[in-house]
């Protein structure tokens, strides 16, 4: 019982730490956790199916040199000031000192209407994805999601602590009763 109790404690405590880090990272990065140049992005549309589905969480790496990008690479770029898009490069052209990337969602019939300037490219898809985990990240970035992801594990830890303390008190009472019974029995026999 003690081993199960300790394992349960470690699992709940680890869950609280992980969820707290996800929430903090999500809040501080504007909704997308980033570590060492890698960012988790939620897939909001089906434009890249079957490569990754709506609701998936994909891992992208910050671009350090756009000249290394090739036709067929999947990139994340800023379509406008507030909209990040992840599509595949279908063509690359040079215009003066800049590269222009023609992109297309795998599930779209036609390429994107405007080419993407190298200045707007932010990251490259690493090939790693977690299906449906993007829904969780989106939930965590909302105020109610933040509250739930911090409060629920906290309540679980409090319930666990209450059960553990209650169990310890019952064990102490049982041992005290047994000791009193042994003391009475030994007093009566003398």
Swiss-Prot record:
The keyword Zinc does not apply. The keyword Heme does not apply. It is a multi-pass membrane protein. Disruption phenotype: Mutation impairs colony surface architecture. The active site is at residue 45. It is found in: Cell membrane. Belongs to the peptidase S26B family. Required for the cleavage of the signal sequence of TasA and TapA, which are involved in biofilm formation. B.subtilis contains five chromosomal type I signal peptidases: SipS, SipT, SipU, SipV and SipW. They have different, but overlapping, substrate specificities and have different transcription patterns. This is Signal peptidase I W. It comes from Bacillus subtilis (strain 168).
């Amino acid at each position: 019982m003690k081993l199960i109790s300790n394992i349960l404690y470690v699992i709940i405590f680890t869950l609280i730490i992980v969820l707290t880090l996800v929430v903090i990272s999500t809040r501080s990065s504007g909704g997308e956790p980033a570590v060492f140049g890698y960012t988790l992005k939620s897939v909001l549309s089906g434009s890249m199916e079957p490569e990754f589905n709506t609701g998936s969480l994909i891992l992208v790496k910050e671009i350090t040199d756009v000249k290394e990008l090739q036709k067929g690479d999947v990139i994340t770029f800023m379509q406008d000031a507030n909209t990040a898009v992840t599509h595949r490069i279908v063509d690359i052209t040079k215009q003066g000192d800049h590269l222009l990337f023609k992109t297309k969602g795998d599930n779209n019939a036609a390429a994107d209407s405007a080419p993407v300037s190298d200045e707007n490219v932010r990251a490259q898809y690493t090939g790693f994805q977690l299906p449906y985990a993007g829904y969780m990240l989106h939930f965590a970035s909302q105020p109610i999601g933040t509250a739930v992801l911090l409060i629920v594990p906290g309540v679980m830890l409090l319930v666990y602590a209450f059960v553990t303390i209650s169990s310890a008190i019952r064990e102490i009472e049982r041992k005290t009763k047994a000791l009193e019974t042994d003391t009475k029995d030994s007093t009566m026999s003398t």
